[in-house]
Every structure is written in C-alpha cells, then in structure tokens.
Amino acid sequence: FEGKYPEAEPAARLLVKQFPEYGDARVLLGRIIAWQGRYDEAAAVIDTLLSSEPDNSDALSALADIRRWSHDRSRQVTAPTDIRAGYMFDTFSEPYERFWQVFTLGAGHRFSWGTAVAAVNYGHINTGPPSGTSDGDFQFAAEAWPELTRKNYAYVSYAYSNGPWFPRHRAALELWQTLPAGLAVSAGVNYYYFDHNIFIGTVSLEKYLAKYWFSGRAYFHFKDIGVTTSFFLNARRYLGTADYVQLTLGTGTAPDEPYDIITDLERQKASSVRLTWFNQINQWWSFRIGAGYSYEKYSATSNRNRFEGNIGIIRGIGRAK
C-alpha cells in the first residue's frame, strides 16, 4: 500500500462487505486499521473473525501483532525515565505472629535495548512471642528487560543484602521466545543464598487472545531430597492500551516468587489467589495495587492463613518519544 492506509481502508472494508466469509479480507482490514494506530478497533475486527474461526492462524497471528504494537505504543507515549515507590506487606499468625513490610524507592529508564530499573528496598519485621522481634534490613536491587531480537527478550536481575532477613544474594535469568498465533514460551532460573544455595527453575506458556492474556507457569525447587513443584495460572484482562486487571491462582510446594525473607523457608505447600490492578493514568503517572491470600502448610500437621498486599506508583520524568 506504500503507506497509503487511509486510501486502502475503504477498499478493504468493501471487500469484507462483498465477501463476509472471506477470512483473509478481515485480517487485511484489521492490519490496515492497526497500521494507522487504532489498535482497539483493529482487535475488534479480528475478534469478529475468531468468533467463527477460533483456530484461524492468520487471525491469531494478526491479533498477537496488534497487541504487541499496542504495547510498544503505550511505552512510546510514556516518559522514558521514571522514579518509582512501592510498599508491600505479608503477614500470618501461626505458629507465631509475623508482619513483614518492604518499602521500595527506585528509578527506571527505557534504553534502546530495553528497560532497566535500580531500587533500594527496606524491609521491617515484627514478630510476636516467643521471639518478639522488631528489626530492619536493606536490600539493593537491579533488574532489566533486554530485547534480544524481535522474537526474543529476557529478564535479568540481581539483589544484595548484608542483613539478616533478605537473602544475601538473589539473582534471576529468564528468556522468552515468541511464537505464531499469539503464543510465547519462556524458561529461567532463580537463585538465592541465605546460608546455603537455593535454585528454583521456571517454565511458562503464554497466550494473547483479543483483550486477554493467559499464562501457565511451573516452578521447580531443586533440593537435596529431590525436586518439588508448583503451578500457577494467570488471566489478565486489558482495559485499554496498558491498563489491566489480573487474577492469579496457584498451588504446589515450590515458591512462586522470590524468597523475600528467610522465614519464607518454613513454607512446605500452599494454595493461593491474587488479584492485581494496573492503571496508566497518563504519560506521567501509573499505579498498581494488589492483594492476595494463601492457605499454606508450614509443618507436617499444621496449616495457616497468610495475607499479602502491595501498592506501587511510577512518576515519569522527561518527554515522551
């Protein structure tokens, strides 16, 4: 079309009207609309086709491209540099009361190769009898999401703490491969060191479908006695270009998240549910809030309820590109 998408769109619409059962025509129309930056409208055109042909590979591939372009556009209209602050808590009351909080302050920047973030975390723990502990700990962390190719990207992170509660060292590496039909797969490993080495591997399968993103993820905790596992399902509903709500369900014996604190080593098995809401208010401000509940085993014969919550704010700096 040599970039003449406004002229090509009426012709594509006429083709769809004359041949409504011709799937390639709807795919073409959806792509032409997306190339003009109208991603929600383009996704709706493809959704119409998928409602009658849910396995149409061309439509699924087009929808994945539209979602990716929409995400790229949302990054372009936000400031490339930001400062960010966050807070989280995690608490239980058996076999003793424990209230763990983490306050975070950091900064991020979007480079040509991807995004990087550096942060300082301050953790504070309060426990009830018999120990009656009230103590704090600092952690210094850095993470990045480099884009290796158009089909591959990665996540790398490292954190260090010299205190008694956070792991001394925490590192992670995960690689993603995008596939046709809106699919992606990943594999990675998380490493922690308290007074011994801990390795947790992870694999995932992801799927974009219209305004939804689904993910199945497994974790493998490598121990001297063997390998323990856990499994998690994520369902995300996009409310706009970047806004979403996400539900996470999980069960198993391997932690699904970093060991934030040494007392997490008590966990033996858990089932959990989490809900997260992310809102990009404008090019300068974005906001995230989440809550979760776990029913976990901490000894051979004892279980407990566990509650968590988190909130984060990001303030952009500089001009959007």
Region annotations inferred by a language model:
Residues R73-T91, H109-A118, A154:
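Transmembrane beta-strand segments of Gram-negative outer membrane beta-barrel proteins
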Residues F1-E2, Q18, W35-Q36, S52, ...:
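Register position in tetratricopeptide repeats
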Residues D90-Q101, V120-F140, S157-G182, S186-E308:
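Outer-membrane beta-barrel translocator/channel fold
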Residues L14-L15, T48-L49:
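Canonical positions in the second alpha-helix
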